[in-house]
């Protein structure tokens, strides 16, 4: 999204520049993989894979140019401390431009977007090989810094999937079939202003749209539509803000104006706490309700301060008094033309708490929508899912050998020795070692790590957002919240063998 034309080869960490000269000489192939070492919540360890296509479009598919090399080289001349020249693999990248038309000479295998996985499952694997004498194997983790950033859309996609699954249960309990479509709009993205960059808003906002359709982050909807073969993704409604409300001498006049400009049969959301939320509910709502109902408008009350749970419940009871309510076939109250949206103080767990309170109060889940801003797009970091890219295998001339990290002081950072494959067993992802005679087993014919890049574009077909949505909903519904069988018996054995070899080499306290 930047107009600065940033040199692509500088989009890595400085220490990556020296790594090609630090790996063992004579290596023929190096492999590394991306994984999540932890879940979003301990009580639900499911994770949604998302963000790979954008990484493909902006990182893997970007062809290296002579200008990239020249600009990087010029800047790096003064990057070293004490006036030392910062050495970097300029020669390898020059070969990429001269012999490979700028295409990155790596292979990348990845899971399908929308896959529901658990910690330790590899999301993608980077395969770097020597090609016709060119030492590209040593570029195995050069792109790690840039590719690592898919952690952010993965966190957001996971949050939205988790919320949808929870609200699905509430809808099943309290909403009639003809109103089930409203589930798509129950979580609305309010996060664009609360993120650190335009790109973050677009990419993480698009991740939200893999489970819901409601968004005020229009650039996210634009990207989602582009990734949906042009079929529109992302909807919203007319809504006021505090600046609109406080511009009028009388707040009720602002409310009336909002209803006036809303098309008949439309939706109008009005922020209700500019002065007194209680006054809005008791004084303004009885006045505006008949005006909205006369136009067939759904009038949505939006509290924006105070206790989120209490604000929603108070709003529902006030709407019931002002608009009236009917009891549906499932025994829950449905307000006639009124609703509440809570967008302040919302995170995943708080949303669950509100949804429980709404059900306990006897209201149908369709009567409440939720807006999430920073809690959806920004309040997260790389450690939210504890993502990492680690070397997993090396070929020093005698075939691939597994490599792993196993720090004695923090076993949670243990990585997996490769190479490996991911297969679905009973509908759940499981990791197997891929070596020896393992390929003779028919279970391994459907490796879920598919080649998306092989020293250039392949015939891999990216799925649409609609297809990704269906995969998430299907796999989430068929998965369990916690899975203790992520690693196959064979992978556990491989892990134990490699760990034992490490202990022999580096005994704790030795």
Give the positions of each predicted feature.
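Generic structural signal of hydrophobic/aromatic residues within well-ordered alpha-helices
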Residues: 52-60, 72-76, 92-96, 100, ...
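N-terminal, Lys/Arg-enriched amphipathic/low-complexity engagement segments
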Residues: 31-99
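Hydrophobic/aromatic residues located in beta-strands of well-ordered beta-sheets
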Residues: 268-270, 340, 370
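Buried, small/hydrophobic-residue-enriched core segments of structured protein domains
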Residues: 2-33, 37-41, 96-105, 114-329, ...
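Active-site and channel-lining beta-strand-loop segments
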Residues: 107-118, 122-124, 442-445, 450-452
